């Protein structure tokens, strides 16, 4: 089969329902098509011993495309490992309809055949790049496909923050924390904090306070090209945590500063040509149909 994709990575959630049958069907199709297959170590037990396996770093270096079988979390985990190498992803959904994994197991082979033949919609989504600064020096950094969260780390105490956008003061707040979200993350934690849903390819960032003390402190959408700077206000009982997609920065101090901006490169998701984000929203959120 003529294709720009010659080496296909297979990544799956080993304990997901229907995972074995779905991966077996995809594996058989790829073998018949004469394509190279590289199976991620975590699901290697679901394949014949002769299958070629590799770690995520090896997949990132060698694969032309990754087929991810599972849910949104499985795809996001793969994206974090692969996006720096420019490996596009295709999501096969097991279980409930996902925002990111949109191909059903019953259609997996047909849809995958079309995508590998070039009949697809490519979608670029930018993560966030965050760094923790102390005395002007970077002491920790990370990336977030969904969100960067600054919070007190305690269910019983609030945190006091000052936020600036491109060096211009935005506001100060007392709250349980602040979510800085990508469009991808706008349907995740930020949504539960009252944030808006952003179209996935929109060049924008959401700032959503978590349970603000001042009720007029509402979520705000800013340019995706803006630099968000967060500082802590003096507090005798200071404690804070900063996390990128639930991966925490260590030892956050009261004089530290957090800088968050759009990452330099996107990750790519390949969808079937009939992909419809609004249909997914209607289904997931139980919106009315016509």
From Swiss-Prot:
Reaction(s) catalysed by this chain, per the record, are:
NAD(+) + ATP = ADP + NADP(+) + H(+)
Question: Flavoprotein as a keyword?
Answer: no
Which GO biological-process labels does this protein carry? NAD metabolic process; NADP biosynthetic process
Identify the keywords attached in UniProt to this record, alphabetized: ATP-binding, Cytoplasm, Kinase, NAD, NADP, Nucleotide-binding, Transferase
Keyword Transferase appears in the UniProt entry: yes
**EC identifiers of the protein:** 2.7.1.23
Amino acids binding NAD(+): 72-73, 146-147, 174, 176, 187-192
Give a GO cellular-component term: cytoplasm
Q: Cellular location of this protein?
A: Cytoplasm
Where in the sequence is the active site?
A: 72 (proton acceptor)
Domain of life from the UniProt record = Bacteria
Q: Molecular function (GO) terms listed? A: ATP binding; metal ion binding; NAD binding; NAD+ kinase activity
Q: Signal peptide: which range, if any?
A: none
Xref: Gene3D superfamilies: Probable inorganic polyphosphate/atp-NAD kinase, domain 1 (3.40.50.10330), Probable inorganic polyphosphate/atp-NAD kinase, domain 2 (2.60.200.30)
What cofactor is needed?
a divalent metal cation
Its job: Involved in the regulation of the intracellular balance of NAD and NADP, and is a key enzyme in the biosynthesis of NADP. Catalyzes specifically the phosphorylation on 2'-hydroxyl of the adenosine moiety of NAD to yield NADP.
Give the similarity note. Answer: Belongs to the NAD kinase family.
- Protein name (record): NAD kinase
Q: Which organism is it from?
A: Methylococcus capsulatus (strain ATCC 33009 / NCIMB 11132 / Bath)
Name the gene that codes for it: nadK
């Amino acid at each position: 089969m003529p294709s720009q994709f010659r080496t296909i990575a297979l990544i799956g959630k080993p304990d997901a329902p229907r995972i074995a049958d779905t991966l077996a069907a995809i594996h058989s199709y790829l073998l018949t098509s004469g394509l190279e297959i590289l199976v991620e170590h975590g699901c290697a037990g679901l394949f014949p011993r002769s299958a070629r396996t590799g770690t995520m770093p090896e997949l990132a270096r060698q694969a032309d495309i990754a087929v991810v079988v599972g849910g949104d979390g499985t795809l996001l985990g793969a994206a974090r490992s692969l996006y720096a190498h420019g490996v596009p992803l295709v999501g096969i959904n097991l279980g409930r309809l996902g925002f990111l994994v949109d191909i059903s197991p019953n259609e997996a082979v047909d849809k995958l055949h079309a995508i590998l033949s070039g009949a697809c919609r490519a979608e670029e989504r930018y993560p966030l790049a965050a760094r923790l600064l102390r005395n002007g020096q970077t002491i920790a950094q990370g990336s977030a496909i969904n969100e960067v969260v600054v919070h007190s780390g305690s269910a019983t105490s609030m945190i006091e923050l000052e936020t600036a956008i491109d060096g211009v003061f935005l506001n100060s707040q007392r709250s349980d924390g602040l979510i800085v979200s990508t469009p991808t993350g706008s349907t995740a934690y930020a949504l539960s904090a009252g944030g808006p849903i952003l179209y996935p390819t929109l060049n924008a960032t959401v700032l959503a306070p978590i349970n603000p003390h001042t009720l007029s402190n509402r979520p705000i959408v800013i340019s995706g090209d803006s630099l968000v700077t967060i500082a802590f206000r003096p507090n005798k009982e200071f404690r804070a945590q900063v996390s990128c997609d639930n991966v925490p920065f260590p030892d956050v101090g009261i004089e530290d500063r957090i800088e968050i901006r759009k990452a330099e490169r996107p990750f790519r998701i390949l969808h079937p040509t009939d992909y419809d984000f609004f249909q997914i929203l209607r289904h997931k959120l139980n919106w009315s149909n016509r």
